[in-house]
Amino acid sequence: ANWNKSLALLLAGRLKEGFEQFEWRWRTKKTGMKAPAIDQPLWLGQFDLDGKTILVHHEQGMGDSIQFCRYIPLLYLQGARVVLMVPKPLVSLMQGLQGIDRVIEVGLPVPHFDCHIPMMSLPLAFQADLDNIPFSQGYLQVDPFKSQQWADRLGPRQRPRVGLVWNGGFRADRPDLWSTNARRNVDLHQMAQAFRKISVDFYSLQKGEPA
C-alpha cells in the first residue's frame, strides 16, 4: 500500500510526501528491489556533508539515472566530494555533470567514501518540490569532440532531428520487470506510420537486440 501511495502522490505532484513513501521500494516485494548492503551510513540530508566523500549509486533504469542526476551538483555545493557509480553506457555522459569528482562503472572497485545515497533518494534528501526541481534548463554537457563528430557524420540539418527509442532494456535477471517492460514498449512500425506526416528527421537511438 505504501509503495502504491508513493506513486499516486508523485503523480499528483505532491513530491515531498511522495518521495518519503518512495523509500518503501526497498521494503516491498512488488518492486523486486533490495537495499544495497553498504557499511557506510545512508545519507538522506540528516548530517553535514562538508569535507566528506559521498557515493551516489545507480538504481533501476538508465533513464532514471539521467533524470535524477540533476541533484548531484547540489551535493557538491554542500562541500561534498562526489563519487558516482553508474552502468558502463552512462560513464562517459555522466563525466560531463558538474560537481562530480569521479565516475566509476558498476562492478568496479569503489574508492573510499564516508556515506552513500541511492540515486532516486536524492529528491528526498533535498526535499524536492515542484518549485525547486534543480537545473530545469539542462544539466548534462555533451563532449564537444563527440558532438562535432556526429555533426560531421550527419551533415547539414534541413529539419528538426528527433531520436527514437521504442523498446526498454530487457533484463534476464529481473523477471519481475518483464511485464512492465512489455507494457511500455512500442512497435516501431506503428510509430513510423504515426510520424509520416511530421516534418522532422528521425534517428534510431535504440540499442541491443530490438534495434
Where are these regions (language model features)?
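Alpha-helical solenoid repeat scaffolds of the TPR/TPR-like class and their adjacent stem/linker regions
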Residues: 1-211
